[in-house]
Amino acid sequence: MTAVLPLALTAAACSRPPEQQFLTQFFRAARARDNTTLAMMSAVSLDPREQGTVEDFTITSVTPENRTPLDLKSLLEAERQARDAESEFAKRKMEYQNANLPVIEQVVKLERDPKARLTPAQQVVKAAWDKWREDSATYTRAVSAARAAVVDATGPAEASLTQPGQPPFDPSAFTGEMVSKDVVLDAEIRNPQGQTAPATLTVTMTRAVGTLGGEAREGRWIITRIAGV
């Protein structure tokens, strides 16, 4: 019997999902508010002061890995085009402004007075200037949206691939995909008031896989979503 026991213990240890150790370390760091460790493991926060802490958990299921191509180059190109379009528009707007500056200044001043009456010439310039200002906001929003798309796409990939001793992440030189899986947990959550209750959590783990500057790279797993807490 004594010879069988170590084998049984080994089998039990081996039956633990590989995600168990990773999540145990993450929840421990969250309880301790170890921000350095958390930053290396997760792109989302789990603040004990707001969401509580995971005191214990059991993994009930892990979904198959899902692979999504990560086309950063097209996103970077879209951002470049948006910035170029905004720059060209700003140039044309400045040309109009310089050509009509005295009247524009009059219009801007009169806009502050609700009782002011514009001359026909001022009304023409005001209509044109309103359109320039409206279009300017449209171009600004387009650049912001393009930039946000780049940040949203590169953030998890950069976090996954940024490792000691490895070259820095260059989104323009990366070709590959994001690999993700959902880990479902039965957890015991202690809320900020100190009360403990069961909860079902779904933790999404993601990593980047591909080539960076022609060199094969495989990123570490990071947490990109925690649902249920």
Model-found features: residue ranges?
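C-terminal or late-domain output modules
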Residues: M1-P6, A13-L70, P167-V229
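N-proximal short alpha-helices
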Residues: A8-A11, R112
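Generic alpha-helix signal with a bias toward terminal, lower-confidence helices
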Residues: A11, L38, S42, P69-S74, ...
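Alpha-helical linker/edge segments of TPR/alpha-solenoid repeat scaffolds
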Residues: N66-E77, R83
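Exposed beta-sheet edge and beta->alpha loop/turn motif
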Residues: R80-V229
